Design a protein with these regions (language model features):
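Hydrophobic h-region of N-terminal signal peptides that target proteins for export
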Residues: 13-19
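Extended terminal accessory/targeting regions
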Residues: 20-147
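Sec-dependent signal peptide recognition
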Residues: 4-12
């Protein structure tokens, strides 16, 4: 048996491990467009529920598990309901994000949109959570938003 055969198998595995390890750190800077594909408020108050959308965007940007997405969507619905007093509007917006926010869609508003596409539903590692905190602090500092 040729001793180099084992090395031929080990090197590709090592490169794959290194590439997979680095992927967890590729988090884009946080961005928000308010209520993606929807208005941010009423004619009288154009930013009425925009704060709800910003909080929801923070959750969607960082991504995580399927349970975390569901919790973010429920919190979004409750925020809109509290801001507007309109349960029907809150439910329509909730259903829209439930249907359109899957992590597998190649959109700018998908679950986990801060990470490269294909991440799916995966819990954030400690290092990824730390990176999220850093990126959010940078965003807040640059926009003077204290969410």
């Amino acid at each position: 048996m040729n001793p180099y055969n084992s090395l031929k198998l080990l090197l590709p595995a090592l490169f794959c491990f290194t590439a997979c390890k680095n992927e967890e750190m590729k988090l884009a800077d946080f961005t928000s467009d308010g209520c993606s594909l929807f208005i941010d408020g009423t004619f009288e108050d154009p930013d009425l529920w925009k704060e709800c959308c910003l909080k929801h965007d923070i959750a969607y940007w960082q991504g995580g598990t399927e349970e975390e997405r569901e919790a973010a969507d429920i919190a979004f619905r409750e925020c809109v309901k509290k801001k507007t007093g309109n349960s029907e509007l809150a439910e329509v917006m909730y259903q829209a994000v439930r249907q359109g926010g899957e992590p597998y869609y190649p959109t700018w508003y998908r679950w986990g949109y801060g990470w490269p596409i294909g991440r799916g539903y995966r819990a954030l590692t400690v290092a990824e959570k730390d990176l999220v905190k850093i990126k959010l602090a940078e965003y807040r500092k640059s926009t003077s938003i204290n969410q």
